[in-house]
Amino acid sequence: RKYFKYYDEISTWQMQHGCMNEHEAFTFYQNSYDFNLEKGLWKDVGEYGGTCDALSADYGVDFKCPTSLDGWLDYIFTGISKQQYNQCQMYMLLFDKPLWKVCAYLTETEWMIQRELSYPVPADKRIILVEVQRNLEWEERLIKNTPFVIEEREKYYQILCDQFGTPSTLIKEQVLITE
């Protein structure tokens, strides 16, 4: 991203489902749990940065829209993934919150809608919440490992420059190609 100034979102149909339904999940949560919930924003803190889904005075929320009933129920029986846990920890660091909530919101997929299928779960029970507490030891490990990660990022960046030229050279070449 730093090199090409381009962010290539990994786009699977599951991620598209989540993006398409995030606003619905936000509105449902806001109306059911916390009228003061606000849309998230981008925040930088030193070398770290991220965009959260939603913020309240004392906590943040990350919305997940699973694409199957089993995937949704996993939030009850197995909790969140390690990746989701790390995401919550990073958001708590960035936004200085003691608590983050993962909100698993069940909504039909496009395939189901086209076939007029519906999950057998009442509309008012379609949220599963998993709470994550801030972990200061996690933050200490992150801070300790950051110099190594930045060093490796810079090596990667240099390899791209060696292979393709500097980013400014790429931009000039793109302009010439499009003219």
Task: Locate each region found by the language model.
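Accessory terminal regions of nucleic-acid processing enzymes
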Residues: 1-179
